[in-house]
Amino acid sequence: MAHPHLLAERISRLSSSLEKGLYERSHAIRLCLLAALSGESVFLLGPPGIAKSLIARRLKFAFQNARAFEYLMTRFSTPEEVFGPLSIQALKDEGRYERLTSGYLPEAEIVFLDEIWKAGPAILNTLLTAINERQFRNGALVEKIPMRLLVAASNELPEADSSLEALYDRMLIRLWLDKVQDKANFRSMLTSQQDENDNPVPASLQITDEEYERWQKEIGEITLPDHVFELIFMLRQQLDKLPDAPYVSDRRWKKAIRLLQASAFFSGRSAVAPVDLILLKDCLWYDAQSLNLIQQQIDVLMTGHAWQQQGMLTRLGAIVQRHLQLQQQQSDKTALTVIRLGGIFSRRQQYQLPVNVTASTLTLLLQKPLKLHDMEVVHISFERSALEQWLSKGGEIRGKLNGIGFAQKLNLEVDSAQHLVVRDVSLQGSTLALPGSSAEGLPSEIKQQLEELESDWRKQHVLFSEQQKCLFIPGDWLGRIEASLQDVGAQIRQAQQC
């Protein structure tokens, strides 16, 4: 693939030209363009009058000298109206059954069939062969047809368990369109003077027949990396577990892979990337219910697994758990231990401070911060005399939170290990230790693991940033993925500060 980034830029400019004068149809144009560039079919679902036919007409201008055919199906439509009339002369003179196909579907590169589900069996059967094999049986001859894009449209879905399902399954991309929603776009649409049938594409951007044929071969050379296949298989397994998931044929999966290859190719990449998998949201649904379900499952895949978000959070959880274990071990070693005094006749157990604690004011560190009296507290200052009296006689004990202000009443106790423990209103406790006896900062083991995890996170974020330049993926999906990665990064940084 020569100059992949130049090709990606050209396709982006081509799409922008095709989108001119069409409001809130950028995604539809881009996916129809991708379908045309990879030889696939598109189904547009939506009410009348929302530019479905105009989208198909625009795609003709993506190619030099492309021929277009469009037809509105009715229940009375005949094969002659779609595939061409019979040649009376050939039948009369030579007894040959032959159609005159000039100007009809068999000789068109871009085909638009409106109200597709109203077509009769004779049309549907011939259409299936045309889509599957790009061939048309004209009498005794089997002719290759040049169709690059079939756009079928309707305001309804095919009935379940009908003869239409075979044709519906051949339509790889399925788009559900609606009226223009944004107020500014609606106004622009009403006041636009642009002739919708004018060619908006500069000749320099149009695709030649030679380019198209060459690209078909190069699309097939785009690789599918193992980690991307694993994501696809994960999605397939998850869908198989869901009772309401739509049936997705092996044929549809295989055709979808070629679409992903085309997305990568026209984005300037040599391999399919996780970001390309977002296209599956427009390939795997069957009806309104499955549309929402597919989008939910792909959202989980993209925000939880595609860039190892869930895996990194699992690793972070294990690191945090290990840190807590080390903290507990350190707490047992460094906590201030008071001395238990004898006293057979005493109603209350008595204690005293260790002999090496001699300062008149003691500053004791909390092994973990607590919220006391609406303040985040990391250390408490005690008057030595007050603490000795409390250890000996009990009663009320007060200390200055973080060493400032007035001494506040505290819920202090001596645990079974003879450590001083302060508790908050929810009775969460924190062991007290003398300054210098508590470990400072993160243990080296934890620090190293967090640094490695942060390095892996940065690599994943860089990979995502490099893959974002994909014309065919909506920006809101990219935003959700970015948010999921930023959330993982924030949790890692928070753990590093503990």
From Swiss-Prot:
Its EC number is 3.6.1.-. It catalyses: ATP + H2O = ADP + phosphate + H(+). InterPro entries: AAA+_ATPase, ATPase_RavA, ATPase_RavA_C, MoxR, P-loop_NTPase, RavA-like_AAA_lid, RavA_ATPases, RavA_LARA_dom. One of its GO terms (molecular function) is ATP hydrolysis activity. Its main location: cytoplasm. It comes from the Bacteria. Keywords: ATP-binding, Chaperone, Cytoplasm, Hydrolase, Nucleotide-binding. ATPase activity is stimulated by ViaA. Transmembrane segments: none annotated. GO terms for cellular component: cytoplasm. It is found in: Cytoplasm. ADP binds at Y23, G49, I50, A51, K52, S53, L54, E196. It is an enzyme of class 3 (hydrolase). Homohexamer. Interacts with ViaA. Belongs to the RavA family. Component of the RavA-ViaA chaperone complex, which may act on the membrane to optimize the function of some of the respiratory chains. RavA functions as an ATPase. This is Regulatory ATPase RavA.
